[in-house]
């Protein structure tokens, strides 16, 4: 019994020592740990590990106690009772009143003597359900070297953009719900400098966690540079490791590899021969068909079993190179309908006329007929004849293949500037000069630009003030009783503004008038210039040839013929002093010609003017000199019907326009310089550009022709804008403008730029179509002329009015 008591006491003491040692270890661990009132994540993890460890130790101790109990069960019941009695006695002794007294010691004092024991083995031991040991290892804490997808973000606002916090002092909230304040921003100058001088690692993005700019670190920049240079990004990898030649690359001759070739390699295979003979027998018997023969059989079978699809799409076959397809028949018209409109049916007179004409001369080979239904239409009787004639045409008529050019039509249209950029030019009618009782055939503008003279079929010449439209002068030059067939054909002011002479062509006469509207000085200068020519022949200043003609009047026949020629030459026109009646009409002198004068044009100096008489033969063109009262006929032979004649603006050249040609003569050398071929059927008028290197001509076949005298004799441009005969064309003296007037009652205004560079062609741009004159008896605008300085246009029409068109 004593021994057993000693054992129990020793067990109790050992338990107390173990408990005291555990308390000491725990106290030492508490000293090592710093507890500040906050539970750290790592501390919690270690506590959890300790709890697991303690539970495992307790389970181990309980298991040992159970084993001891099992051993004690083997003792006898008597010994068990004795032990129980001793334990009860000991228990009564152990329980003391002091243990149940109030303990005033603190937890710190109680744990002051406790010592903790650290275990080196990190594994935790447990048991499975079958009783075997189970080792619970600690959790693995992975280290993320390159992936931070599971890392917690500092700013927990989710997918909300940072722009939602622009008006707030913070940029979001952290995991604890506290605000993340916005970082301080620099001044506008600092932001400007930062945008100019970009810092290293600048990305232009905002960091969602801090609200500041997101810059790349040096490691990230180095990584990007390595990727750009195609280098290794991991420093632990050695790209130049030493080569270990595990297997030799040199083939060695060994007994296993240098075996001699067997004989069967050089002897034909009997097995292959059997297989080949088997295939040959199958081909001979027809069980195997070669691919070529099989293809031929399929094509033959396809041709034999071919069925034409009547309603399928037609497939085009490749024609021969020399094959020309027949041209398609024109589609049927309304006349060929079985139920044509009434206006296509022929009247009895038209049917009779159609039947009386020859078959080859008929406009159509059938008579349009009307049927109430398509089923009532009979067969066409001329179908066989038409097919036969078409076959003859295809067989006998030669045909040529014409390759169609694939050209974009827009590429052929020249790129012209907008008319808005080419102003000024006339666009509206501002003044109407009304008062004439007949057609206004001609008009002319004074060199000063103040007075407008018009000539009409009523036999009057009127002078108008341009700005006000007031009539300031009127004279009647045609007496209907004496000369009923005369008209005022042409009227032209002298280009010299200091004399005020107005030349008027009336029938066969040319009147030089000085209207009393300028003042004494100008009127006196004009009359003096005209009167000075009367003394030219009086004082013996006649040509010697004319004197010789007069002296050889009684000579031989040759002398008589020569004198007759000179006499005719001298009598081409006669300068007559005005009668008293003509003086009352302000006529200073009258030049009488043989035929009707249609056109008149002054030289730029104002001393010469040229007239055109289309019906006068070789004397159709006459040059008159005012200062000497002389008239010359420069041509000995007629060059067709002359329509117009003009002087060159500054060269001694004369432009003569016939019905189809324009000839340029040099008056100083008396030679033909150039012959222009406009290509028109009947020219009406010409005008020369102020620079003298371009010419425009109008024709009665509705065309306006532009000739560049430095280029070929054919037209540079042909303008077909009018619908009827073009009567007049005129260049502006100062501005790059020209106009054309026609019988359709319209006036077309064009912009014409002539470049100094000889390599550039003139630029012609249509600007405006002026309408206002009425068409009377198929006559519209008869004449047009430009103002000397302004972009104003004057026009004369068959509606008895003249108009001023301004910008």
Swiss-Prot record:
Modified residues (Phosphoserine): 23, 72, 76, 146, 149, 418
Region (Required for interaction with NOP7): 265-383
SUPFAM superfamilies listed in its UniProt record: WD40 repeat-like (SSF50978)
One GO CC term on file: nucleolus
Region (Disordered): 1-108
Main location group: nucleus
Secretion signal span: none
Biological process, per Gene Ontology: maturation of 5.8S rRNA from tricistronic rRNA transcript (SSU-rRNA, 5.8S rRNA, LSU-rRNA); maturation of LSU-rRNA from tricistronic rRNA transcript (SSU-rRNA, 5.8S rRNA, LSU-rRNA); ribosomal large subunit biogenesis; rRNA processing
Compartments in which it is found: Nucleus, Nucleolus; Nucleus, Nucleoplasm
Region (Required for interaction with YTM1): 383-419
Skewed-composition ranges (Basic and acidic residues): 57-69
Free-text function comment from the UniProt entry: Component of the NOP7 complex, which is required for maturation of the 25S and 5.8S ribosomal RNAs and formation of the 60S ribosome.
Family affiliation: Belongs to the WD repeat BOP1/ERB1 family.
Name this protein carries in UniProt: Ribosome biogenesis protein ERB1
Source species of the chain: Saccharomyces cerevisiae (strain ATCC 204508 / S288c) (Baker's yeast)
Gene symbol of the encoding locus: ERB1
